[in-house]
Amino acid sequence: MHPKQQRESFRSKQYTGTTSGMCDNYLQANMIILPKEYAFEFLLFCQRNPKSCPIIDVLEEGVTTPQIADADIRTDLPKYRIYRNGQLDKEVTDIKDKWRADFVTFLIGCSFTFEKALIENGIRLLHQEQERVVPMYKTNIPCEKAGRFEGNMVVSMRALEPEEIDKAVKITERFETSHGSPVHIGNPEEIGIKDIDNPDYGESISFDKKKRTPVFWACGVTPQNVGLNVKPPIMIAHAPGHMLITDQLEEK
Amino acid sequence: MHPKQQRESFRSKQYTGTTSGMCDNYLQANMIILPKEYAFEFLLFCQRNPKSCPIIDVLEEGVTTPQIADADIRTDLPKYRIYRNGQLDKEVTDIKDKWRADFVTFLIGCSFTFEKALIENGIRLLHQEQERVVPMYKTNIPCEKAGRFEGNMVVSMRALEPEEIDKAVKITERFETSHGSPVHIGNPEEIGIKDIDNPDYGESISFDKKKRTPVFWACGVTPQNVGLNVKPPIMIAHAPGHMLITDQLEEK
Protein backbone atom coordinates (compact mmCIF):
# COMPACT_ATOMS: atom_id res chain seq x y z
CA MET A 1 0.00 0.00 0.00
CA HIS A 2 1.19 3.55 -0.70
CA PRO A 3 1.99 5.63 2.44
CA LYS A 4 -0.86 8.08 1.79
CA GLN A 5 -3.45 5.28 1.59
CA GLN A 6 -1.94 3.51 4.57
CA ARG A 7 -2.13 6.69 6.66
CA GLU A 8 -5.76 7.13 5.61
CA SER A 9 -6.50 3.68 7.03
CA PHE A 10 -5.16 4.96 10.37
CA ARG A 11 -7.05 8.24 10.11
CA SER A 12 -10.34 6.43 9.53
CA LYS A 13 -9.41 4.01 12.35
CA GLN A 14 -9.83 1.02 10.04
CA TYR A 15 -6.46 -0.13 11.33
CA THR A 16 -4.74 0.79 14.62
CA GLY A 17 -1.95 -1.81 14.86
CA THR A 18 1.84 -1.66 14.47
CA THR A 19 3.43 -0.23 11.32
CA SER A 20 6.21 -2.82 11.33
CA GLY A 21 6.79 -4.11 7.79
CA MET A 22 4.36 -1.63 6.19
CA CYS A 23 5.06 0.45 3.06
CA ASP A 24 8.34 -1.15 2.09
CA ASN A 25 11.11 1.33 1.20
CA TYR A 26 9.43 4.30 2.88
CA LEU A 27 11.06 5.87 5.92
CA GLN A 28 9.19 5.48 9.21
CA ALA A 29 9.72 7.87 12.11
CA ASN A 30 9.50 8.10 15.88
CA MET A 31 7.42 11.11 16.93
CA ILE A 32 7.64 13.31 20.04
CA ILE A 33 5.46 16.35 20.67
CA LEU A 34 6.36 18.90 23.37
CA PRO A 35 5.17 22.39 24.31
CA LYS A 36 7.39 25.07 22.74
CA GLU A 37 8.78 25.95 26.14
CA TYR A 38 10.80 22.70 25.93
CA ALA A 39 11.59 22.80 22.20
CA PHE A 40 15.00 24.50 22.21
CA GLU A 41 16.48 22.24 24.87
CA PHE A 42 15.03 19.10 23.29
CA LEU A 43 16.30 20.01 19.81
CA LEU A 44 19.73 20.71 21.30
CA PHE A 45 19.60 17.35 23.10
CA CYS A 46 18.91 15.63 19.77
CA GLN A 47 21.72 17.52 18.07
CA ARG A 48 24.16 16.51 20.81
CA ASN A 49 23.06 12.87 20.69
CA PRO A 50 22.67 12.13 16.98
CA LYS A 51 23.03 8.36 17.32
CA SER A 52 20.03 8.05 19.66
CA CYS A 53 18.07 10.97 18.23
CA PRO A 54 18.66 11.40 14.49
CA ILE A 55 16.33 14.29 13.63
CA ILE A 56 14.62 13.80 10.29
CA ASP A 57 12.05 16.60 10.51
CA VAL A 58 10.84 19.27 12.96
CA LEU A 59 7.39 20.88 12.80
CA GLU A 60 7.37 24.37 14.24
CA GLU A 61 4.81 25.39 16.84
CA GLY A 62 1.27 24.66 15.78
CA VAL A 63 2.29 23.02 12.49
CA THR A 64 0.60 19.67 11.82
CA THR A 65 1.97 18.70 8.38
CA PRO A 66 5.57 17.46 8.14
CA GLN A 67 7.84 18.34 5.23
CA ILE A 68 8.49 14.64 4.60
CA ALA A 69 4.87 13.41 4.58
CA ASP A 70 1.62 14.79 3.22
CA ALA A 71 0.05 13.87 6.54
CA ASP A 72 -1.77 15.30 9.54
CA ILE A 73 0.27 14.16 12.52
CA ARG A 74 -2.81 14.49 14.79
CA THR A 75 -4.65 11.64 13.04
CA ASP A 76 -2.30 9.76 10.70
CA LEU A 77 -0.46 7.50 13.14
CA PRO A 78 -2.24 4.33 14.25
CA LYS A 79 -1.75 4.90 17.98
CA TYR A 80 -0.48 7.62 20.34
CA ARG A 81 0.62 7.80 23.96
CA ILE A 82 -0.16 10.81 26.11
CA TYR A 83 2.17 11.39 29.04
CA ARG A 84 1.47 13.89 31.81
CA ASN A 85 4.15 14.94 34.31
CA GLY A 86 6.35 12.04 33.18
CA GLN A 87 3.66 9.36 33.57
CA LEU A 88 1.67 7.53 30.90
CA ASP A 89 -1.84 8.95 31.03
CA LYS A 90 -3.48 7.01 28.19
CA GLU A 91 -3.24 5.52 24.71
CA VAL A 92 -5.44 7.06 22.02
CA THR A 93 -5.95 6.68 18.27
CA ASP A 94 -5.91 10.40 17.48
CA ILE A 95 -4.90 13.59 19.29
CA LYS A 96 -7.23 16.10 17.63
CA ASP A 97 -8.85 17.16 20.91
CA LYS A 98 -5.45 17.37 22.66
CA TRP A 99 -3.78 19.60 20.08
CA ARG A 100 -2.39 22.97 21.19
CA ALA A 101 -1.07 25.89 19.16
CA ASP A 102 2.22 25.80 21.09
CA PHE A 103 3.02 22.14 20.31
CA VAL A 104 6.30 21.45 18.51
CA THR A 105 6.69 18.04 16.82
CA PHE A 106 9.97 16.16 16.38
CA LEU A 107 10.36 13.27 13.94
CA ILE A 108 13.29 10.98 14.68
CA GLY A 109 14.75 8.14 12.60
CA CYS A 110 14.02 4.54 13.55
CA SER A 111 15.79 1.23 13.08
CA PHE A 112 13.25 -0.27 10.67
CA THR A 113 15.35 1.25 7.89
CA PHE A 114 18.65 -0.42 8.69
CA GLU A 115 16.99 -3.72 9.59
CA LYS A 116 15.78 -4.00 6.05
CA ALA A 117 19.31 -3.41 4.75
CA LEU A 118 20.69 -6.08 7.10
CA ILE A 119 18.20 -8.67 5.84
CA GLU A 120 18.84 -7.76 2.22
CA ASN A 121 22.50 -8.47 2.92
CA GLY A 122 21.77 -11.95 4.21
CA ILE A 123 21.85 -11.24 7.96
CA ARG A 124 19.08 -13.07 9.84
CA LEU A 125 17.23 -11.07 12.50
CA LEU A 126 15.94 -13.41 15.20
CA HIS A 127 13.28 -11.08 16.61
CA GLN A 128 11.64 -10.92 13.20
CA GLU A 129 11.89 -14.70 12.75
CA GLN A 130 10.42 -15.18 16.22
CA GLU A 131 7.78 -12.51 15.51
CA ARG A 132 8.69 -10.42 18.52
CA VAL A 133 9.32 -6.73 19.10
CA VAL A 134 13.10 -6.12 19.16
CA PRO A 135 14.41 -6.24 22.78
CA MET A 136 15.47 -2.86 24.20
CA TYR A 137 17.46 -2.10 27.35
CA LYS A 138 18.29 0.84 29.57
CA THR A 139 22.09 1.24 29.77
CA ASN A 140 24.67 3.09 31.85
CA ILE A 141 25.88 5.02 28.77
CA PRO A 142 25.18 8.69 29.56
CA CYS A 143 23.71 10.91 26.87
CA GLU A 144 25.14 14.37 26.49
CA LYS A 145 22.95 16.70 28.56
CA ALA A 146 21.10 19.70 27.10
CA GLY A 147 19.34 22.01 29.54
CA ARG A 148 16.86 19.96 31.56
CA PHE A 149 17.16 16.95 29.25
CA GLU A 150 19.54 14.31 30.55
CA GLY A 151 19.67 10.57 31.07
CA ASN A 152 21.15 7.34 29.79
CA MET A 153 20.93 5.79 26.36
CA VAL A 154 18.39 3.08 25.54
CA VAL A 155 19.70 0.45 23.11
CA SER A 156 18.16 -2.24 20.92
CA MET A 157 19.84 -5.64 20.62
CA ARG A 158 20.27 -8.03 17.72
CA ALA A 159 22.14 -11.30 18.30
CA LEU A 160 24.43 -11.99 15.34
CA GLU A 161 26.79 -14.75 14.29
CA PRO A 162 30.42 -13.66 14.78
CA GLU A 163 31.16 -13.61 11.04
CA GLU A 164 28.17 -11.29 10.41
CA ILE A 165 29.28 -8.54 12.79
CA ASP A 166 31.79 -6.73 10.57
CA LYS A 167 29.28 -6.62 7.75
CA ALA A 168 26.52 -5.35 10.06
CA VAL A 169 28.77 -2.54 11.32
CA LYS A 170 29.64 -1.48 7.78
CA ILE A 171 26.01 -1.56 6.63
CA THR A 172 24.53 0.34 9.57
CA GLU A 173 27.20 3.05 9.80
CA ARG A 174 25.89 4.37 6.47
CA PHE A 175 22.44 5.00 7.99
CA GLU A 176 23.07 8.25 9.82
CA THR A 177 19.36 9.04 10.10
CA SER A 178 18.73 5.56 11.45
CA HIS A 179 21.05 5.33 14.50
CA GLY A 180 24.25 4.46 12.55
CA SER A 181 26.80 1.88 13.70
CA PRO A 182 26.50 -0.17 16.93
CA VAL A 183 27.36 1.51 20.25
CA HIS A 184 28.52 -1.75 21.84
CA ILE A 185 29.36 -5.29 20.78
CA GLY A 186 29.63 -8.33 23.02
CA ASN A 187 29.36 -7.67 26.74
CA PRO A 188 25.94 -6.54 28.03
CA GLU A 189 27.23 -6.05 31.59
CA GLU A 190 29.78 -3.51 30.43
CA ILE A 191 26.96 -1.15 29.45
CA GLY A 192 24.88 -1.87 32.54
CA ILE A 193 22.57 -4.61 31.21
CA LYS A 194 22.21 -7.21 33.95
CA ASP A 195 19.92 -9.75 32.28
CA ILE A 196 19.82 -10.02 28.50
CA ASP A 197 16.67 -12.15 28.77
CA ASN A 198 14.79 -9.39 30.58
CA PRO A 199 14.59 -6.36 28.29
CA ASP A 200 13.18 -3.06 29.61
CA TYR A 201 11.12 -2.56 26.44
CA GLY A 202 10.07 -4.87 23.62
CA GLU A 203 10.27 -8.64 24.01
CA SER A 204 12.93 -11.17 24.92
CA ILE A 205 14.29 -13.34 22.11
CA SER A 206 15.80 -16.81 22.40
CA PHE A 207 19.30 -17.32 21.01
CA ASP A 208 22.24 -19.65 21.54
CA LYS A 209 24.68 -17.57 23.63
CA LYS A 210 27.57 -19.79 22.51
CA LYS A 211 26.92 -19.21 18.82
CA ARG A 212 25.67 -15.63 18.66
CA THR A 213 27.00 -12.31 20.00
CA PRO A 214 24.67 -9.54 21.22
CA VAL A 215 25.16 -6.32 19.22
CA PHE A 216 23.66 -3.07 20.55
CA TRP A 217 22.46 -0.02 18.65
CA ALA A 218 21.32 3.37 19.99
CA CYS A 219 17.53 3.34 20.09
CA GLY A 220 14.83 5.90 19.34
CA VAL A 221 13.21 5.15 22.70
CA THR A 222 16.06 7.18 24.28
CA PRO A 223 14.53 10.63 23.64
CA GLN A 224 11.12 9.48 24.90
CA ASN A 225 12.74 8.13 28.04
CA VAL A 226 14.83 11.25 28.60
CA GLY A 227 11.82 13.45 27.83
CA LEU A 228 9.83 11.76 30.59
CA ASN A 229 12.65 12.40 33.11
CA VAL A 230 11.93 16.11 32.67
CA LYS A 231 8.26 15.52 33.63
CA PRO A 232 6.71 18.01 31.22
CA PRO A 233 3.02 18.74 31.99
CA ILE A 234 2.23 17.10 28.65
CA MET A 235 4.24 15.09 26.12
CA ILE A 236 2.75 13.07 23.28
CA ALA A 237 4.54 10.27 21.41
CA HIS A 238 3.70 7.48 18.98
CA ALA A 239 2.83 4.24 20.77
CA PRO A 240 5.88 1.91 20.51
CA GLY A 241 5.96 0.30 17.05
CA HIS A 242 3.15 2.58 15.80
CA MET A 243 5.24 4.97 13.75
CA LEU A 244 4.61 7.78 11.31
CA ILE A 245 5.01 6.39 7.79
CA THR A 246 6.55 9.16 5.67
CA ASP A 247 6.52 9.78 1.92
CA GLN A 248 10.31 9.75 1.85
CA LEU A 249 12.10 6.80 0.33
CA GLU A 250 14.76 5.25 2.52
CA GLU A 251 18.36 6.17 1.86
CA LYS A 252 20.27 3.40 0.10
CA MET B 1 50.53 32.08 20.76
CA HIS B 2 48.32 29.49 22.47
CA PRO B 3 44.53 30.18 22.27
CA LYS B 4 44.22 30.71 26.03
CA GLN B 5 46.97 33.37 26.06
CA GLN B 6 45.61 34.97 22.92
CA ARG B 7 42.14 35.23 24.44
CA GLU B 8 43.65 36.78 27.56
CA SER B 9 45.15 39.51 25.38
CA PHE B 10 41.60 40.29 24.22
CA ARG B 11 40.19 40.11 27.73
CA SER B 12 42.76 42.60 29.01
CA LYS B 13 42.11 44.75 25.90
CA GLN B 14 45.81 44.69 24.98
CA TYR B 15 44.66 43.74 21.49
CA THR B 16 41.27 44.35 19.86
CA GLY B 17 41.99 43.66 16.16
CA THR B 18 41.04 40.86 13.78
CA THR B 19 41.80 37.21 14.62
CA SER B 20 42.68 36.39 11.01
CA GLY B 21 45.80 34.21 10.92
CA MET B 22 46.00 33.82 14.72
CA CYS B 23 46.60 30.54 16.59
CA ASP B 24 47.34 28.36 13.59
CA ASN B 25 45.52 25.01 13.58
CA TYR B 26 42.89 26.06 16.13
CA LEU B 27 39.27 26.35 15.06
CA GLN B 28 37.80 29.86 15.03
CA ALA B 29 34.07 30.47 15.30
CA ASN B 30 31.37 32.97 14.38
CA MET B 31 29.28 33.86 17.44
CA ILE B 32 25.63 34.89 17.72
CA ILE B 33 23.83 35.58 20.99
CA LEU B 34 20.02 35.76 21.17
CA PRO B 35 17.43 35.82 23.95
CA LYS B 36 16.10 32.32 24.66
CA GLU B 37 12.75 33.27 23.19
CA TYR B 38 14.43 33.03 19.74
CA ALA B 39 16.72 30.07 20.47
CA PHE B 40 14.57 27.17 19.22
CA GLU B 41 13.78 28.78 15.88
CA PHE B 42 17.37 29.90 15.35
CA LEU B 43 18.80 26.46 16.18
CA LEU B 44 16.29 24.91 13.79
CA PHE B 45 17.30 27.44 11.13
CA CYS B 46 20.94 26.39 11.55
CA GLN B 47 20.04 22.72 11.39
CA ARG B 48 18.07 23.26 8.17
CA ASN B 49 20.88 25.31 6.60
CA PRO B 50 24.05 23.44 7.58
CA LYS B 51 26.18 24.86 4.77
CA SER B 52 25.66 28.47 5.88
CA CYS B 53 25.32 27.73 9.59
CA PRO B 54 27.45 24.76 10.66
CA ILE B 55 26.83 24.64 14.43
CA ILE B 56 29.97 23.79 16.36
CA ASP B 57 28.74 24.57 19.88
CA VAL B 58 25.65 25.92 21.66
CA LEU B 59 25.74 27.49 25.14
CA GLU B 60 22.44 27.09 26.95
CA GLU B 61 20.74 30.08 28.54
CA GLY B 62 23.00 32.02 30.85
CA VAL B 63 26.05 29.83 30.14
CA THR B 64 29.23 31.80 29.34
CA THR B 65 31.84 29.04 28.87
CA PRO B 66 31.75 26.99 25.66
CA GLN B 67 32.51 23.27 25.60
CA ILE B 68 35.18 23.84 22.96
CA ALA B 69 37.09 26.69 24.65
CA ASP B 70 38.09 27.43 28.24
CA ALA B 71 36.87 30.96 27.65
CA ASP B 72 34.38 33.56 28.87
CA ILE B 73 32.47 34.58 25.77
CA ARG B 74 31.59 37.94 27.38
CA THR B 75 35.22 39.12 27.35
CA ASP B 76 37.37 36.78 25.26
CA LEU B 77 36.62 38.00 21.75
CA PRO B 78 38.46 41.11 20.56
CA LYS B 79 35.36 42.97 19.39
CA TYR B 80 31.56 42.62 19.52
CA ARG B 81 28.61 44.16 17.72
CA ILE B 82 25.38 44.92 19.52
CA TYR B 83 22.27 45.06 17.36
CA ARG B 84 18.91 46.36 18.57
CA ASN B 85 15.71 45.81 16.60
CA GLY B 86 17.75 44.72 13.58
CA GLN B 87 20.03 47.79 13.56
CA LEU B 88 23.68 48.07 14.60
CA ASP B 89 23.69 49.94 17.90
CA LYS B 90 27.42 49.91 18.67
CA GLU B 91 30.75 48.07 18.67
CA VAL B 92 32.24 47.20 22.05
CA THR B 93 35.24 45.25 23.36
CA ASP B 94 33.33 43.30 26.00
CA ILE B 95 29.68 42.58 26.79
CA LYS B 96 29.86 42.09 30.56
CA ASP B 97 27.38 44.87 31.31
CA LYS B 98 25.02 43.69 28.54
CA TRP B 99 24.86 40.05 29.67
CA ARG B 100 21.45 38.58 30.54
CA ALA B 101 20.56 35.27 32.17
CA ASP B 102 18.29 34.38 29.23
CA PHE B 103 21.00 34.75 26.55
CA VAL B 104 21.72 31.68 24.42
CA THR B 105 25.02 31.63 22.48
CA PHE B 106 25.59 29.90 19.15
CA LEU B 107 29.07 29.17 17.78
CA ILE B 108 29.18 28.59 14.04
CA GLY B 109 32.05 27.36 11.85
CA CYS B 110 33.98 29.84 9.70
CA SER B 111 35.94 29.64 6.48
CA PHE B 112 39.36 30.34 8.03
CA THR B 113 39.68 26.56 8.45
CA PHE B 114 39.22 25.55 4.85
CA GLU B 115 41.25 28.49 3.54
CA LYS B 116 44.26 27.11 5.33
CA ALA B 117 43.72 23.72 3.70
CA LEU B 118 43.43 25.33 0.26
CA ILE B 119 46.73 27.17 0.69
CA GLU B 120 48.47 24.06 2.00
CA ASN B 121 47.37 22.36 -1.20
CA GLY B 122 48.96 25.01 -3.38
CA ILE B 123 45.87 27.09 -4.17
CA ARG B 124 46.58 30.85 -4.07
CA LEU B 125 43.97 33.02 -2.34
CA LEU B 126 44.02 36.50 -3.84
CA HIS B 127 42.30 38.29 -0.96
CA GLN B 128 45.06 37.12 1.37
CA GLU B 129 47.77 38.10 -1.11
CA GLN B 130 46.10 41.51 -1.54
CA GLU B 131 45.63 41.77 2.25
CA ARG B 132 41.91 42.30 2.01
CA VAL B 133 38.90 40.85 3.80
CA VAL B 134 37.34 38.16 1.58
CA PRO B 135 34.52 39.66 -0.57
CA MET B 136 31.00 38.57 0.45
CA TYR B 137 27.73 39.00 -1.44
CA LYS B 138 24.01 38.75 -0.80
CA THR B 139 22.49 36.22 -3.23
CA ASN B 140 19.06 35.15 -4.46
CA ILE B 141 19.58 31.62 -3.04
CA PRO B 142 16.83 31.20 -0.43
CA CYS B 143 17.68 29.61 2.89
CA GLU B 144 15.25 27.09 4.29
CA LYS B 145 12.95 29.01 6.63
CA ALA B 146 12.53 28.14 10.34
CA GLY B 147 9.86 30.01 12.27
CA ARG B 148 10.54 33.72 11.99
CA PHE B 149 14.03 33.18 10.57
CA GLU B 150 14.15 33.46 6.80
CA GLY B 151 16.21 35.12 4.11
CA ASN B 152 18.76 34.54 1.38
CA MET B 153 22.22 33.05 1.63
CA VAL B 154 25.31 35.24 1.87
CA VAL B 155 28.34 33.81 0.05
CA SER B 156 32.07 34.45 0.06
CA MET B 157 34.01 34.43 -3.22
CA ARG B 158 37.47 33.19 -4.14
CA ALA B 159 38.65 33.58 -7.74
CA LEU B 160 40.47 30.42 -8.82
CA GLU B 161 42.30 29.24 -11.91
CA PRO B 162 40.18 26.71 -13.85
CA GLU B 163 42.52 23.81 -13.11
CA GLU B 164 42.33 24.50 -9.35
CA ILE B 165 38.55 24.24 -9.08
CA ASP B 166 38.16 20.46 -8.91
CA LYS B 167 40.79 20.27 -6.22
CA ALA B 168 39.18 23.10 -4.23
CA VAL B 169 35.79 21.34 -4.35
CA LYS B 170 37.30 18.08 -3.12
CA ILE B 171 39.22 19.78 -0.32
CA THR B 172 36.38 21.93 1.00
CA GLU B 173 33.65 19.27 0.85
CA ARG B 174 35.47 17.48 3.69
CA PHE B 175 35.03 20.51 5.97
CA GLU B 176 31.44 20.03 7.06
CA THR B 177 31.82 22.36 10.05
CA SER B 178 33.36 24.98 7.79
CA HIS B 179 30.71 25.50 5.06
CA GLY B 180 31.68 22.45 2.93
CA SER B 181 31.82 22.49 -0.88
CA PRO B 182 31.01 25.56 -3.05
CA VAL B 183 27.35 26.49 -3.60
CA HIS B 184 28.03 27.99 -7.04
CA ILE B 185 30.84 28.10 -9.59
CA GLY B 186 31.21 30.52 -12.46
CA ASN B 187 28.27 32.84 -13.05
CA PRO B 188 27.65 35.51 -10.38
CA GLU B 189 24.47 36.76 -12.10
CA GLU B 190 22.86 33.35 -11.82
CA ILE B 191 22.84 33.69 -8.02
CA GLY B 192 21.78 37.34 -8.05
CA ILE B 193 25.17 39.05 -7.82
CA LYS B 194 25.09 42.06 -10.16
CA ASP B 195 28.59 43.47 -9.70
CA ILE B 196 31.42 41.19 -8.59
CA ASP B 197 33.56 44.27 -7.90
CA ASN B 198 31.05 45.62 -5.39
CA PRO B 199 30.71 43.13 -2.54
CA ASP B 200 28.05 43.65 0.15
CA TYR B 201 30.54 42.79 2.92
CA GLY B 202 34.33 42.56 3.03
CA GLU B 203 36.46 44.11 0.32
CA SER B 204 36.70 43.89 -3.45
CA ILE B 205 39.66 42.01 -4.89
CA SER B 206 41.27 42.52 -8.29
CA PHE B 207 41.54 39.51 -10.59
CA ASP B 208 41.83 38.79 -14.30
CA LYS B 209 38.29 37.72 -15.29
CA LYS B 210 39.67 35.94 -18.35
CA LYS B 211 42.04 33.76 -16.35
CA ARG B 212 40.17 33.12 -13.11
CA THR B 213 36.68 31.84 -12.29
CA PRO B 214 34.72 33.11 -9.28
CA VAL B 215 33.85 30.28 -6.87
CA PHE B 216 31.24 30.89 -4.15
CA TRP B 217 30.92 29.29 -0.72
CA ALA B 218 28.10 29.61 1.84
CA CYS B 219 29.18 32.19 4.40
CA GLY B 220 28.82 32.52 8.16
CA VAL B 221 27.46 36.05 7.71
CA THR B 222 24.20 34.41 6.57
CA PRO B 223 22.84 33.69 10.08
CA GLN B 224 23.73 37.20 11.27
CA ASN B 225 21.96 38.67 8.27
CA VAL B 226 18.90 36.46 8.68
CA GLY B 227 18.89 37.11 12.43
CA LEU B 228 18.68 40.85 11.81
CA ASN B 229 15.67 40.38 9.48
CA VAL B 230 13.76 39.17 12.54
CA LYS B 231 14.58 42.43 14.36
CA PRO B 232 15.08 40.94 17.83
CA PRO B 233 15.15 43.59 20.60
CA ILE B 234 18.78 42.59 21.16
CA MET B 235 21.25 40.39 19.28
CA ILE B 236 24.99 40.31 19.89
CA ALA B 237 27.59 38.98 17.44
CA HIS B 238 31.36 39.04 16.99
CA ALA B 239 32.50 42.01 14.90
CA PRO B 240 33.31 40.72 11.37
CA GLY B 241 36.74 39.05 11.39
CA HIS B 242 36.95 39.23 15.20
CA MET B 243 36.17 35.60 15.98
CA LEU B 244 36.19 33.37 19.02
CA ILE B 245 39.43 31.36 18.96
CA THR B 246 38.62 27.91 20.39
CA ASP B 247 40.83 25.26 22.01
CA GLN B 248 39.76 22.73 19.40
CA LEU B 249 42.22 21.70 16.72
CA GLU B 250 40.93 21.95 13.19
CA GLU B 251 39.72 18.80 11.50
CA LYS B 252 42.19 17.49 8.95
Swiss-Prot record, chains A, B:
Disulfide bonds: none annotated. SUPFAM superfamilies: PSTPO5379-like. GO terms for molecular function: lyase activity. InterPro entries: D-Glu_cyclase, Putative_hydro-lyase, UPF0317. Gene3D superfamilies: PSTPO5379-like, PSTPO5379-like domain. Pfam families: D-Glu_cyclase. Its EC number is 4.2.1.-. Keywords: Lyase. HAMAP family: Hydro_lyase. Belongs to the D-glutamate cyclase family. PANTHER family: D-GLUTAMATE CYCLASE, MITOCHONDRIAL. This is Putative hydro-lyase OB3382.
